[in-house]
Amino acid sequence: MRCFVTRPTAASVTLLVAVSLAVGGCGSTGNSPAAGCLSQPVQSAAPGAAAGWTLPGGNLQNTRAVASPITSSNVAQLGVAWCVPVESTGVTKAAGLANGYATTAVVVNGVVYTQDQESNVMAIRLATGKVLWTHNYNSLNGGPDGVNVVGGTVYAATDSAAVALSAATGRQLWSRTLIGNDHEGIDMAPGYNDGTVYVSTVPVNPNKGQYLGGAKGTLWALNAATGAPEWSWDEVQNLWGNPGINSGGGLWDPPSFDAQGNLYIGIANPGPIGQTGWPKGYPWGTSRPGPNLYTDSVVKLSPQGKLLWYYQLTPHDLYDWDLQDSPVLTTANGQPVVIDGGKAGILIELNAQTGKLLWKLPVGVHSGHDNDGLLTENATPTSTIPLPAKFDLEPGVFGGVESQLATNGSTAFAAVNNLAVPMSAKGVTESSATFEASIGKATGEMVAVNQDTGKIEWDDKLPSSPYGAAAVTNNVVFTTTYNGDLYAFDAATGAILLKTPLSAGTNAPVTIAGDYVIAGAGVPLSTSQQPLIIAYKLGATGKLPDTAG
């Protein structure tokens, strides 16, 4: 069977079929499997594993671990079941992004819900690959974006607003503009807990630029039924005294939630940063002296938005080292802990009650500049900075732990990217074209870390950067790599169980739903490659288009 594609027949909101809420595919929902589906029993869920991938991070704790029939003994039986094209309306192409798709899909009641980098939302029948509806916003965002589906409502965002759609039809129910100025944007999947939707702005607007003065991250708590604000929390209060130049903060991914409804968020970097060039007269972040709270931090907030604690990994960040990944709530040594990592290429484990650091572990390649911010946080524009005039910085802007972690309850898994950039007192010295070429040549690693000790259990070197995060089911860990491969590893040993090509390059994570694995390939690296959302299924025998590769 050849991989087939199904397309919506019109732009804007198009209802192709009435959406039945009955499960029609093969999953672990308790319904009888449909004809032709393999019938392996669902393995008992590891600690923290969800019954299905119904939330952006798998569950409220963002463990990216789910129960499924997929194991190390049958993962090689995954084959192509269906494909749906990622079709740009021209906005991403005009921005040089070419069919951008970077999100983790969610699967609710047998329907796959997802979003592309033009903020367009799509519903796809899991069992057949049939597109049920689309709602096109044609609103460019920086990604990873995505949706959250709860109680028959799809929560999403455009580059400026949080929105709610009917899960059955795609009809918009409400919209709430959140950005404070046109230097800001939104590029995350909303969080949801107990009737409240959580969305943060970021200091990036693809139509205007990034880290422009006055742009900041603000976390909004919105009434899920109406979109009305309940509270907001400023992630970078006062922009450190110079809002005309400074910027910073923002969330890439949804908050995590504990049983009491407390929120845990990972906050992005301050600006200006070296990657975009220092503003005249203010080298090395001297327009923003001090540690620049609460950037590059894990922050715990109460359900009412009160700050409970924070841990800052990179004070006075110079190099775009966001701590942007959703904090993972799990246990270690019998105690609740928070594990996180980001573009600094450092994993941390914190006491969930107090925020105390339990362990800290650099992963991937580091070039010796992890603490440069401490050398410069009290500098003035005329200070002599004890750094080389030129040096190679690693992790660079697209290095470190760029995408989300996963845990099986005892081991944390991190997809690590090794990519250096040349740096100087004026900023990055590499041209855009050279930098883009270097992304394709970069390598990476999948790293497994013992949560009790903070020690590496295994570390698999990869020929291409795994921007596809980590996802776990039973004893299998999945990721995708930039050059367009889907990988599966043995969770205990790191042995590669599966390596199979996608239809194009990718920076999108996978979703595990029953005996399906859904992966997006939205980065064509040649004119022959096709941007597709691909569903792999145990026992399926379809093929990717002949032009892929």
Model regions and ranges:
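Aromatic (tryptophan-biased) beta-strands that constitute blades/sheets of beta-rich domains
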Residues: P33-G96, K130-Y137, R171-G180, A228-V236, ...
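Repeat-blade elements of multi-bladed beta-propeller folds
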Residues: A50-G58, G96-N120, S139-A162, G185-Y211, ...
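Bacterial N-terminal signal peptides that target proteins for export
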Residues: M1-V13
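Conserved blade-register residue in beta-propeller folds
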Residues: A123, A164, A221, V298-K300, ...
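C-terminal motif of bacterial Sec signal peptides marking the signal peptidase cleavage site
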Residues: A22-G25
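Acidic, glycine-rich loop-and-beta core segments that form the ion-binding/anion-interacting portion
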Residues: L293, S302-P303, D320-A379
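Bacterial signal peptide processing site
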Residues: G27-T29
